[in-house]
Amino acid sequence: MKEQDILENQNWLEVWHHYYDPELELEPNDPNAICISSVDSTGMPNGRYVLLKDVSEKGFLFYTNLKSQKGKELFVAGKGALTWWSRAQNKSVRVQGTVEQVRDDIADTYWASRKEDAKISAILSKQSDEVASREQLEEEFAKLKAEYAGKDIPRPKHWSGV
């Protein structure tokens, strides 16, 4: 695809894949890292990095703690933005749009694919809150790991896809 063809293309998904797909082969370190931007109640913008998990005609999908500052801001505003940068291609893509939470069955399916430690970390994480100490966090982690040993770990309702 020539640069002019890309700029004139009305199919956003085709344009996305034109840049994103080669990056999966070219960049060994988190080629799916995206910066999600939201605004707080005063209109101050906030950006943070998350890992993109899927792209389809429905949009871009990542998972997060809905009680985090990011989750709250995205849903209060009902819209957000993402920026993705390709180191290998020296290109960036900006996207703006509305925000929706995925259905529970979609979040549950992805949750089931996660490793046990990642699930426990998601349960423990109180994003945007200060942690008393690393030792306390490690103790709580060990306690939950023992509690869930050999059991299914349920997805917390505040953890979902956006």
Predicted feature residues:
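Binding-site signature for planar aromatic cofactors or substrates
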Residues: 1-162
